[in-house]
């Protein structure tokens, strides 16, 4: 595995993997220091009126307010075309399949839709995932000041904006919740392992 991270966010007509449609996907690749590589991609995918009409009320309002619903109607991009565009961008920065983990916020939901609709993209990514929401949940339990002090998130509910927010959020946790660089000494690490005892 290499140090780069593939950040993906999807917008869907809902969260039901059995029936809802993937209507927007964005991707950014970062290095291990969370610097964005390249311009990234943000693709709106066409869905028919029946799929849009089946959205739950809260999702309907969210996508109408963001302008996504109108863009979905106007888009002529298919799932297969979107998948190839995302893969082309990722391959520029991650030339070997299976080496970079997927990163994002509550990323398992996105991964489910990617696995269903974009199998080539799914298999190009490493099976491991870095979920910023896991760090958020641990911070809430262990470091509530960090949790409650986190920067406010925007409410764009658009894929590329959501990725940028996730990267910003992980930068925040890195500076507040993780051990400062260069990290613990070898002897400090050994002491923690000894304290934990055998498995």
UniProtKB/Swiss-Prot annotation:
Kindly indicate whether the keyword Cell inner membrane belongs to this entry.
Answer: no
Q: Which residues form the active site?
A: 127
Q: Name one Pfam family in it.
A: RNase_T
Localization, UniProt: Cytoplasm
Record-level Gene Ontology MF annotations: 3'-5'-RNA exonuclease activity; nucleic acid binding
Which InterPro entries does the annotation name?
A: Exonuclease_RNaseT/DNA_pol3, Oligoribonuclease, RNaseH-like_sf, RNaseH_sf
Major enzyme class: hydrolase
Keywords attached to this Swiss-Prot or TrEMBL record, sorted alphabetically, are: Cytoplasm, Exonuclease, Hydrolase, Nuclease
For whether the record's keyword set contains Nuclease, the answer is yes
> Where the protein is mainly located, per its record?
cytoplasm
The Gene Ontology CC terms held by the record are:
cytoplasm
Instruction: Tell me which EC number(s) this protein carries.
Output: 3.1.15.-
Which positions fall inside the Exonuclease domain?
5-170
The UniProt similarity line reads: Belongs to the oligoribonuclease family.
Query: What is this protein's function?
Result: 3'-to-5' exoribonuclease specific for small oligoribonucleotides.
The name of this protein is Oligoribonuclease
Query: What's the encoding gene here?
Result: orn
């Amino acid at each position: 595995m290499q140090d780069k991270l593939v950040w993906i966010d999807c917008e869907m007509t809902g969260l039901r993997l059995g029936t809802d449609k993937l209507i927007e996907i964005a991707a950014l690749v970062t290095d291990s220091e969370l610097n964005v590589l390249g311009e990234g991609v943000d693709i709106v995918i066409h869905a028919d009126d029946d799929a849009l009409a089946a959205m739950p009320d809260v999702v309907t309002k969210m996508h109408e307010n963001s302008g996504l619903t109108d863009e979905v109607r106007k888009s002529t991009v298919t799932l297969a075309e979107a998948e190839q565009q995302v893969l082309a961008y990722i391959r520029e920065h991650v030339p070997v399949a299976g080496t970079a983990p997927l990163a994002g916020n509550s990323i398992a939901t996105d991964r489910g839709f990617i696995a269903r609709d974009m199998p080539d993209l799914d298999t190009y990514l490493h099976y491991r995932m870095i979920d910023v929401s896991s760090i958020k949940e641990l911070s809430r339990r262990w470091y509530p000041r960090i949790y409650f002090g986190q920067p406010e998130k925007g409410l764009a509910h658009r894929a590329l904006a959501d990725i940028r927010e996730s990267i910003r959020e992980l930068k925040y946790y890195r500076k507040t919740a993780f051990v400062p660089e260069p990290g613990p000494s070898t002897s400090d690490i050994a002491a923690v392992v000894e304290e934990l005892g055998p498995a």
